[in-house]
């Protein structure tokens, strides 16, 4: 994906919207080409079973999106304020996708936290 753009649900390439700006623990970091547009990660990816990372304006981890075999999101690992889970405190949490719909955030399991905590270093 990266500099080539994202795929639409129909499998066609969309206009170039993203660029790769580096890697974090082996996962490509994406950045919007037009910073004025919505900053969320792409809804589809070119390579099945891919993950991408989004950083905040200060270069700190904001989100990791894991895509499945069908190139649609499986889950998002977020690090930020989430009112239902932690009020105004930044907390790591997960949003699963069920039938393409992003679910409310949930606390991470211990094994999920252990797998993804490397992305939160210096942020907690």
Task: Please state what every model-predicted region is.
Residues 2-124:
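Catalytic toxin/effector domains delivered as secreted proteins or via bacterial secretion systems
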